[in-house]
């Protein structure tokens, strides 16, 4: 089933190529959506795809790039809207 997930990743996740790594992994998995840095030093991701694939993507987000130090991943599930055509860095 196609789902939508809203993620907020906290820790040392800005300035460590986290967004670029997330985009690369999302494209590899065929996930659509976006990733952006937030003013509170977190990273936010809105992603859509098959639920099992999103679970794998979330597991990657728990680790991030080799330079990242992820402390927490907040997860909010929702219904897919089909609004995204690719995966972008905002």
Predicted regions span which residues?
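Intrinsically disordered, low-complexity, mixed-charge
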Residues: 1-90
């Amino acid at each position: 089933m196609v789902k939508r997930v809203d993620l907020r990743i906290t820790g040392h996740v800005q300035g460590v190529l986290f967004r670029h790594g997330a985009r690369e992994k999302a494209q590899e998995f065929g996930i659509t959506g976006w990733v952006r840095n937030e003013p509170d030093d977190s990273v936010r991701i809105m992603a859509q795809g098959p639920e099992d694939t999103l679970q794998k993507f979330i597991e990657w987000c728990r680790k991030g790039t080799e330079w990242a130090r992820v402390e927490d991943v907040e997860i909010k599930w929702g219904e897919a809207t089909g609004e995204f055509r690719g995966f972008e860095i905002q």
